[in-house]
From Swiss-Prot:
InterPro entries recorded: Imprinting_Balance_Reg
Top-level taxon of the source organism: Eukaryota
Organism listed in the record: Arabidopsis thaliana
Disrupted gene: phenotype observed: Suppressor of the triploid seed abortion phenotype observed in osd1 and jas-3 mutants, thus leading to enlarged and somewhat fertile triploid seeds production characterized by abnormally normalized parental imprinted genes expression.
GO cellular component: nucleus
Tissue-by-tissue expression: Paternally imprinted expression in the endosperm.
GO BP: endosperm development
Name this polypeptide is given: Protein ADMETOS
Its biological purpose: Product of a dosage-sensitive gene that contributes to the maintenance of paternally and maternally imprinted gene expression in the endosperm in order to balance parental contributions. Underlies postzygotic reproductive isolation by promoting triploid seed arrest in a genetic dosage-dependent manner, thus being a component of postzygotic interploidy hybridization barriers.
Additional information: In Greek mythology, 'Admetos' was one of Jason's companions Argonauts in his quest for the Golden Fleece. Product of a paternally expressed imprinted gene (PEG).
Gene: ADM
High-level lineage: Eukaryota, Viridiplantae, Streptophyta, Embryophyta, Tracheophyta
């Protein structure tokens, strides 16, 4: 693959030109055009499908992050590339993490970090059963479930697990505990540059086996301390996510039945 500047200084192989085109359109932050062109190339190309999928993942996540639901809430399901409310399957989360470059493969497309932050923010909320239930209830009206240009035709969702239909339209302020839904309505939820307690920390994570269940383990560790050193392995990255310093490590899965979890 190529990086932006290097690609302009060397001769591009014919098979790389469609990918370079997708790269340049995405670099201009025209996410919808980049997604359209990438989808067309993916359908027409007989090779390089994995690389097109990496670009599509970034486009889908950032389009969803920029397009609100009709009631003003963030499209958190769109930000994890699900088409509608339902069970958040760990194997789908693992697939998206790999496309975003958190596994054994890299993603050289622009805005990979921004897409990762949006993805982790939405995942952190939807992986909390209590907040997910409130969010599903707030977005259960059929009007709120109409596609807003965020549908990803390549993601399969378990239709038997869809929930929240038939509850009728509801205002967020009418919901019990509706103050938590402000998490889904923040205009710029990430990144948070300030240290210390942030607005997004009004609720805590629960240890309910967040993460993929097969292949590599994604271990998310919150580092509440502010200045001390973090022990970083070669497969770890340190990010500010949800207002905290977070170390994310990709570990090789062992021959065991242990399930990865998210710990504070």
């Amino acid at each position: 693959m190529f990086s932006g500047e290097g690609a302009s200084q060397i001769r591009i192989a014919p098979e790389d030109k469609p990918i370079q085109w997708c790269y340049q359109i995405l670099k201009s932050r025209d996410f919808k055009s980049a997604r359209y062109i990438t989808q067309m190339n993916l359908k027409l190309s007989k090779t390089r499908h994995d690389e097109y999928e990496k670009g599509l993942a970034i486009c889908d996540i950032l389009i969803a992050a920029e397009n609100r639901l009709p009631n003003g809430l963030l499209d958190c399901y769109g930000m994890i590339r699900m088409t509608r409310p339902g069970l958040v399957l760990y194997q789908n989360i693992e697939k998206e993490l790999n496309l975003l470059g958190w596994g054994n493969i890299s993603n050289p497309f622009p805005f990979r970090q921004e897409a990762s932050e949006k993805f982790f923010f939405a995942w952190s909320l939807l992986s909390n059963p209590t907040i997910k239930e409130m969010y599903d209830y707030a977005t259960s009206d059929e009007v709120n479930l109409e596609p807003q240009g965020n549908v990803n035709e390549y993601m399969d969702v378990d239709s038997s697990s869809q929930s929240g239909y038939g509850l009728g339209s509801v205002l967020c302020s009418d919901l019990p505990g509706s103050e938590y839904l402000k998490e889904f309505a923040d205009v710029y939820p990430l990144p948070l540059a300030e240290k210390g307690q942030a607005p997004h920390n009004r609720f805590g994570w629960y240890d309910h086996n967040v993460g993929p269940e097969t292949n590599n383990n994604v271990v998310v560790t919150y580092e509440d301390a502010k200045e001390e050193e973090c022990d970083m392995s070669s497969s770890s990255e340190l990010r500010i996510i949800n207002g905290r310093r977070v170390k994310i490590t990709i570990e090789e899965a062992a021959e065991t039945s242990d399930t990865p979890s998210c710990s504070r």
